[in-house]
Amino acid sequence: SVGFKAGVKEYKLTYYTPEYETKDTDILAAFRVTPQPGVPPEEAGAAVAAESSTGTWTTVWTDGLTSLDRYKGRCYHIEPVPGEADQYICYVAYPLDLFEEGSVTNMFTSIVGNVFGFKALRALRLEDLRIPPAYIKTFQGPPHGIQVERDKLNKYGRPLLGCTIKPKLGLSAKNYGRAVYECLRGGLDFTKDDENVNSQPFMRWRDRFLFCAEALYKAQAETGEIKGHYLNATAGTCEEMIKRAVFARELGVPIVMHDYLTGGFTANTSLAHYCRDNGLLLHIHRAMHAVIDRQKNHGIHFRVLAKALRMSGGDHIHSGTVVGKLEGERDITLGFVDLLRDDFIEKDRSRGIYFTQDWVSLPGVIPVASGGIHVWHMPALTEIFGDDSVLQFGGGTLGHPWGNAPGAVANRVALEACVKARNEGRDLAAEGNTIIREASKWSLELAAACEVWKEIKFEFAAVDTLDR
């Protein structure tokens, strides 16, 4: 007779363990589970734990060759989602041994691999992860972090200002460099390659890098401030990406850029290691994130992608604006902004934070607010994001009626006015418009910007909201 009982058995017999006490070394996950009709939540939660760890659809005799108790994921708690008929938050604990050290790629392949196509579930979303210090210690994390970046740039006590060069595609390298120069000369700290500017027929990467470096040095000489342009090193292969980063370093520029979701975590971590070894800051763009994170009942929440980026490595990451043209509810956004910047974050469900997270010694990441923002938003942005942020105005700089440099001047004047008002103890939320109006009296550039954008608002309800 065979030494094991063949056949299909319910997942919950093995993988649903409500009595389990989580360990300090476990990776904990909170999944929003929508089971198919007729599937009980315990079975659905156990199925998630099984399929994302050691389980398969039937009993196999090789299970007897290892200790499932030691290696299996466990669904240890289930709670119904308030206001939703058939959604549950299922908490799963994974033993640390299931994951390769220092590999975000491997962590995601396990936790959000096959399980998302699982038939017993109508939908599945990974809401949050608790990464234990034991695992965090296997990652280098951001190449430099917030304090080192401020020291490199010699800029303190205020948010940094950026601008994405538009039109994003179609400019020649020389005209592109000209726009970079004008913006930096006008008072911005950074300009930025758009995420889809890589190396296209109208502007090859090497030409762009050269003209942007020239613009950078010229603007630095004229303003006496350190300037940066995020040179997008994203490429079709890792080797090509590193080649571009090497060239950027040879030009002596301070910062490069990567599209971390389309480029992939393996490429991103390689680039982050190169950047730390060679003194380059690394700006991260999140192109493709909304494909993954925008639906409320399926996918991965951005706070998880943000945590993953902090582990993989990046000094800046785009994180929504709360006030512009792109998705982002205030409390949720501030929740993952804190996850990016702070060393220790308490569990706080009102901001979507399911677990207390201790980052031990991993440097912080600066959140970048970008997308449909302009001078009238400056008080709100200063109030919401605080000093450790980059505020990025693309159209809000280049769309100025007098041109790029005056657009940059308007933004810098508005920012300095808001920081000054805040430092004097004024309430930016209540007096924001007044502060901007006062400042525009002694800056014609700001007055012109105020006139152009006084009516623009992007008023749509957020799709991804807190559960009430």
From Swiss-Prot:
Cofactor: Mg(2+)
Main location class: plastid
Places the protein is found: Plastid, Chloroplast
EC numbers, comma separated: 4.1.1.39
Family matches, as SUPFAM superfamilies: RuBisCo, C-terminal domain, RuBisCO, large subunit, small (N-terminal) domain
Active site per database record: K166 (proton acceptor), H285 (proton acceptor)
PTM-bearing positions, type N6-carboxylysine: K192
A molecular-function term among this protein's GO annotations: magnesium ion binding
Post-translation changes: The disulfide bond which can form in the large chain dimeric partners within the hexadecamer appears to be associated with oxidative stress and protein turnover.
Binding residues annotated for substrate, in chain numbering: N114, T164, K168, R286, H318, S370
Site entry (Transition state stabilizer), positions: K325
Cofactor binding summary note: Binds 1 Mg(2+) ion per subunit.
One BP annotation, GO: reductive pentose-phosphate cycle
Recorded catalytic activity of this chain's protein: 2 (2R)-3-phosphoglycerate + 2 H(+) = D-ribulose 1,5-bisphosphate + CO2 + H2O; D-ribulose 1,5-bisphosphate + O2 = 2-phosphoglycolate + (2R)-3-phosphoglycerate + 2 H(+)
One GO CC annotation: chloroplast
Binding residues for Mg(2+): K192, D194, E195
Quaternary assembly: Heterohexadecamer of 8 large chains and 8 small chains; disulfide-linked. The disulfide link is formed within the large subunit homodimers.
Protein family membership: Belongs to the RuBisCO large chain family. Type I subfamily.
Misc. comment: The basic functional RuBisCO is composed of a large chain homodimer in a 'head-to-tail' conformation. In form I RuBisCO this homodimer is arranged in a barrel-like tetramer with the small subunits forming a tetrameric 'cap' on each end of the 'barrel'.
PANTHER family documented for this protein: RIBULOSE BISPHOSPHATE CARBOXYLASE (PTHR42704), RIBULOSE BISPHOSPHATE CARBOXYLASE LARGE CHAIN (PTHR42704:SF15)
Listed name of the protein: Ribulose bisphosphate carboxylase large chain
Gene name for this UniProt entry: rbcL
